[in-house]
């Protein structure tokens, strides 16, 4: 049996776990306060790459939760680490929000482009709430070549206050259906 007295670090998902949209769940503040008061720690984890860590710090502050940038582990950060280690120097087409592109750049990823070019060497996508048909078309066209296809996370949907919306995995499913290419997923799986 799990002895909660031995737990020192708690990991919390965010979307649909501690809040939904801009609505904090009633138990969240008290739970986090109790964890801190008992001398333990917590980190926030998310596959949602549509926001940067600084966006999340601001969002939690608006919801009444104090957090520092070091309190987060995101699929954007993990994607940046992967790209730096495996595709350094490659010219990347990135489909994602402005925050996703900024997060990659702030984490040391270089040569990021958000428009089609013949010399692109890899395709990267995240949860793109600013998705356009032009981005879908560019990814499909680029992936007719034998280049890497990297995705921030496999989530098919993201919970919101009004239901679910298509997430990174759904966009990847469209691209896979169009090209036959499957992405290499970085973020944690839904399993």
Residue ranges and their predicted role:
Residues 1-14, 18-191:
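HAD-like aspartate-dependent phosphatase fold
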């Amino acid at each position: 049996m799990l002895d909660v007295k031995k737990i020192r670090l708690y990991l919390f998902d965010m979307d649909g776990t501690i809040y939904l949209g801009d609505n904090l769940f009633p138990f969240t503040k008290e739970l986090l306060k109790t964890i801190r008061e008992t001398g333990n720690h917590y980190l926030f984890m998310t596959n949602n790459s549509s926001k940067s860590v600084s966006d999340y710090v601001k969002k939690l502050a608006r919801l009444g939760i104090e957090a520092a940038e070091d309190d987060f582990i995101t699929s954007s950060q993990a994607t940046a680490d992967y790209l730096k280690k495996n595709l350094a120097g490659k010219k990347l087409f990135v489909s994602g929000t402005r925050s996703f592109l900024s997060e990659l750049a702030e984490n040391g990823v270089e040569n990021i482009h958000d428009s089609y070019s013949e010399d692109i060497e890899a395709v990267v996508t995240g949860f793109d709430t600013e998705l356009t048909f032009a981005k879908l078309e560019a990814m499909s066209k680029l992936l007719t070549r034998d280049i890497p296809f990297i995705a921030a996370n496999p989530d098919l949907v993201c919970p919101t206050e009004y239901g679910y919306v298509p997430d990174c995995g759904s966009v990847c499913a469209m691209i896979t259906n169009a090209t036959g290419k499957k992405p290499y997923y970085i973020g944690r799986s839904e399993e």
